[in-house]
Amino acid sequence: MIREIFPGVYVAEIETEMVGVRHLNYSFLRGAASERSVLIDCGFPEKADPSCGTALREVMRMLGFRPDRLDVLITHGHKDHLGQARALAAEGARIFVNPEDMDQSAILNTLLMDEAGRRQLFRLVGLETYDRETYEAFWQAADCFSEGYEGVWDFPYLPIRPGDCRQVGDYRLEVTALPGHTRGELGFFARAQKFIFSGDHILEEVAPIVSNIGEFPNALSSYIASLGEAAARFSDYLFVPGHGAPFRNPRTAVEKTIRYYHRHCENLYHIVRAAGEPLLLRDIGAMAYRRYQRPLTEKEREVCIQIWFKTYACLKYLEEQGALREEIKEGASYWQSLQ
């Protein structure tokens, strides 16, 4: 479905075939005759999700956009937001990304894409303490995070940073920092018309995953602070997220997300405190989500891998608050209560 939310501003909501991502948005701003038009984010790579690539080309055809007259502004470096950047760049599109976020995304994704990085991650969460069959089953599940994504971050790009601005038709797009979901996530907003392309910073349907694994210290506390700032600064704006329908009144979604993380952190704290002994990261996640009570399907193991990232961010937040302490033993993350 394509909707024109302002004159010359289009949002196309696309269904995907990917685990954990039911739909995503392609947003376009039509430039003046002498200008390049703009696309905000570009979905999964076609090799990983052929329907995503087909949908983008069909929307571009219907709206009359050509790759060689297109600037693609990336909100953040996750593969469901820059997946087709390489293909579009090969056809003449210019890709703009925050270099800080590309660096962090490379670190995070290497943990699953690269064999050495994956072993490091599995050691950190405590998988090496389990039987070989469990380890290999999770290894196979982790392949879904690499298959179809070869070279996905390997494309030429131009830097774009908070404070930059550009004119696109009647719209002056300004760039703002929205840290939390990733370290360098960006928002693109039109002050006069009061709308903002907000990536995955604020979503109505789910609480975005926050991860401390990688070079992003204090990720959750940064995210909570940034949510409050965005809700206050853009309180009367139309939010155009990376997933889901555009919405107003961001305060409702922000408060829902913060409540979710506070409840989740409280639950993790009580799990660790009740144990009376150090717990591995994977065990804490299993208890919190009540998983691993039966053999898991491969899709469920894929979800569990994503849970590790969120759980670690929450535990590091509790450590920052002085409630828990982490100890690394032979590369594995153990947690115990300080209160």
Give the predicted meaning of each segment.
Residues 37, 72, 94, 196, ...:
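Hydrophobic "anchor" residues on beta-strands that sit immediately upstream
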